[in-house]
């Protein structure tokens, strides 16, 4: 993203691709880098196949997350960070660790039957968000981060763990837009303030509902975690403590 931003500062738009890579973490981490330079950031990555096409019974495409981040004027940045599946795979993993059920529509079992059992979902398929629409988005992201870059896509990408003879093979795409090359920054800032106020002025279905912009809930949660710490289920604490012991690190404070 740094290179994409440098290009955008010169030309207005900067695009950079990475091939033959690995899992690159949270997509919004990269797009929010652009916000700090008064730019709009976009990024996507492909991933190990986790979803079938509509009507399919095999994993063919990853959930290929995408993110946009846009400076929010006087408000927090507007950040979209979403997988092309109905939910990120990590949420199913966490539910399985906690022994919790998952909502219907998140995933299927290994035969393609809808399930609320997180353990069965771990060996099944993720459901695309919006059915064929989410699948279509995932395919486009696969093509942006695979063939366009001369890299891998689909079943050519290995699992996150278990194969260490070569890189996982993921591709990443980064784009930055320098706002000042399109419109004066102050004018953009005022427009963002007005737009966010407009969205938040929407009447609600009841008095307990709050209108949020994309990324605002996560922004508030991050601030809370910085103040109060990160709660972890006991199973994860025990796993971390065991890793500490195996690595010769004192787990004091974890248990």
Task: Describe each region flagged by the PLM.
Residues 89-150, 162-167:
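Small-residue-enriched flexible segments
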Residues 14-19, 128, 174-180:
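Short glycine-rich or small-residue beta-strand-to-loop segments that form or flank ligand, phosphate
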Residues 1-78:
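A glycine-rich, acidic short-motif signal
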Residues 84-87, 133, 179-181:
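Glycine-rich beta-alpha junction loops
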Residues 148, 153-255:
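Catalytic-core signal marking the mid-to-C-terminal active-site face
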Residues 2-5, 32-35, 69, 105, ...:
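Predominant activation on well-ordered alpha-helical scaffold segments within soluble catalytic domains
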């Amino acid at each position: 993203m740094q290179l994409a931003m440098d290009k955008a500062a010169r030309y207005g738009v900067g695009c950079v691709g990475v091939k033959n890579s690995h899992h690159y973490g949270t997509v919004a981490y990269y797009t929010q880098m652009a916000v700090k330079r008064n730019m709009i950031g976009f990024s996507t990555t492909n991933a190990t196949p986790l979803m079938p096409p509509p009507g399919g019974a095999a994993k063919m495409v990853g959930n290929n997350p995408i993110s946009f981040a846009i400076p929010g004027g006087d408000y927090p940045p507007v950040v979209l960070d979403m997988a092309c599946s109905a939910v990120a795979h990590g949420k199913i993993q966490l539910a399985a660790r906690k022994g919790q059920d998952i909502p219907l529509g998140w995933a299927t079992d290994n035969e393609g039957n809808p399930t609320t059992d997180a353990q069965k979902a771990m060996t099944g398929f993720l459901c695309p968000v919006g059915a064929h629409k989410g699948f279509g988005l995932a395919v486009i992201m696969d093509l942006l981060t695979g063939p366009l870059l001369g890299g891998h896509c689909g079943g050519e990408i290995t699992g996150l763990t278990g194969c260490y003879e070569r890189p996982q093979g993921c591709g990443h795409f980064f784009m930055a837009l320098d706002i000042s090359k399109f419109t004066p920054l102050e004018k953009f800032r005022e427009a963002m303030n007005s737009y966010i106020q407009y969205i938040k002025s929407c009447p609600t279905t009841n008095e307990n509902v709050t209108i949020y912009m994309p990324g605002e809930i996560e922004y508030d949660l991050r601030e809370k975690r910085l103040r109060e710490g990160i709660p972890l289920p006991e199973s994860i604490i025990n796993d971390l403590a065991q890793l500490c012991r195996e690595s010769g690190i004192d787990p004091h404070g974890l248990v």
